[in-house]
Amino acid sequence: MKVLEDLYYSKDHVWVKVEGDKAYIGITDYAQDSLGDAEYIELPEVGTEFTAGDVLGVIESAKAASDVYIPVDGEVIEVNNAVAEDPSLVNSDPYGSWLVAVRLKDKAQVEKLMKAEEYKKFLET
């Protein structure tokens, strides 16, 4: 499984990339591999506010429908429509195919997420 060094990871197999007070959020290589071929992705609208642990969206595959849990508090400021229109992008490029961008409410929450090495160890358990 591919794990990128410059991202933060949740136990729900969601990655977070921080740029200033903005965070891009997507699913990990492990998550997309477990789900199988994504067929449909339901994403929130711009302006939607979330608290860490809320369901951000749903990814449906032939195997299952899986909730995507947001690991930080924030307001959606951008939605990746390309992924909504072509869900297979999360399979072919899970780290390049972010789902949403949020304005972070508390950057300290990101520091509580796993860094790459911790996430790799988590995957081994």
UniProtKB/Swiss-Prot annotation:
Binds 1 lipoyl cofactor covalently. One of its GO terms (cellular component) is cytoplasm. SUPFAM superfamilies: Single hybrid motif. Pfam families: GCV_H. Keywords: Lipoyl. Residues 22-103 form the Lipoyl-binding domain. It comes from the Bacteria. HAMAP family: GcvH. The glycine cleavage system catalyzes the degradation of glycine. The H protein shuttles the methylamine group of glycine from the P protein to the T protein. The glycine cleavage system is composed of four proteins: P, T, L and H. Belongs to the GcvH family. This is Glycine cleavage system H protein 1.
